[in-house]
Amino acid sequence: MHAASREALAKVSSDLDAALAADNTMAVAAQAGTELFDVVDILDGDRALRVAVADSSKDAHSRVGLIEAVFGGKVSPSVLEVLKDAAEQTWSTPREFRAGLVQLGRRALLRSAEKQGQLGQVEDELFRLSRILDRESKLTQLLSDRTQEIGGRRDLLAKVLYGKVTAVTEALALQAIGRPEHNPIDDIAALAGAVAELQGRSVAHVVTAVELNEGQQQALAEKLGRIYGRAMSIHSEVDTSLLGGMIIRVGDEVIDGSTSGKLERLRASFA
């Protein structure tokens, strides 16, 4: 996002948090997230409306009036206020206005998970889903096929997820499938990282030769926390080709302690 859009999103996000905190119920936050996603779908199907509600050449009053005319009575009063607040801001492009609404919808759903004490579970489910999609290339291809209707692709993923994840995880994942400018694997993995950030944690991506148990993950999180000076979430996966040890990535920094990596460095030293 450009600077103006980042500023607009920060303002509306703060207002959204305040509104959800004032109500303090999980159901209201979940409804807000769902309705914001519904609004995004409407904007996706109406380019003229998408451009008009974020047209910076028009005054804010006109944009807010358009929001009221289109969505008044169709969404809850609290979501209508969020939409009016968003329309009042200056966004760099209509695309970034739409992206901002996606972020707001996600934020509302995550606040509902927070009120239920499910943030950690949602984070883990999203990360696991991103790894499943990475392994199941046929499924990912079907979910990414833009020649097929979004509704059909979402129905397919809903069948895969049914009864296996929280309602918040399912809602977030289904919405991600409809984002044509994003790879669903990367988008869902980034969502898991956003959940960690909401909990005040940074993410350590860990690849190991054998699966880490819960105690080992906790010990690794504590050790990395001491190294980096902040709380850490461990997103781990198994790659038997490492032979042993692990590879850790935190941001742009990579620590290769795998057996295969050590052997490769040893071979290079004799070259």
Curated annotation (Swiss-Prot):
Coiled-coil annotation: which residues?
Answer: none
Q: Topologically, how does it sit relative to the membrane?
A: Peripheral membrane protein
Query: GO terms for CC?
Result: plasma membrane; proton-transporting ATP synthase complex
**What are the TM regions of this chain, as residue ranges?**
none
Disulphide connectivity of cysteines: none
Cross-referenced InterPro entries, in alphabetical order? ATPase_OSCP/d_CS, ATPase_OSCP/dsu
Give the principal location in a single coarse category. Answer: membrane
Keywords from the named record:
ATP synthesis, Cell membrane, CF(1), Hydrogen ion transport, Ion transport, Membrane, Transport
Annotated compartments: Cell membrane
Domain of life per record: Bacteria
Q: Name one GO molecular function term.
A: proton-transporting ATP synthase activity, rotational mechanism
Family recorded in the similarity comment: Belongs to the ATPase delta chain family.
Function (record text):
F(1)F(0) ATP synthase produces ATP from ADP in the presence of a proton or sodium gradient. F-type ATPases consist of two structural domains, F(1) containing the extramembraneous catalytic core and F(0) containing the membrane proton channel, linked together by a central stalk and a peripheral stalk. During catalysis, ATP synthesis in the catalytic domain of F(1) is coupled via a rotary mechanism of the central stalk subunits to proton translocation.
Write down the NCBIfam families for this protein, in alphabetical order: ATP_synt_delta, PRK13430.1
Q: How does it assemble?
A: F-type ATPases have 2 components, F(1) - the catalytic core - and F(0) - the membrane proton channel. F(1) has five subunits: alpha(3), beta(3), gamma(1), delta(1), epsilon(1). F(0) has three main subunits: a(1), b(2) and c(10-14). The alpha and beta chains form an alternating ring which encloses part of the gamma chain. F(1) is attached to F(0) by a central stalk formed by the gamma and epsilon chains, while a peripheral stalk is formed by the delta and b chains.
Task: Please identify the protein, giving its name as recorded.
Answer: ATP synthase subunit delta
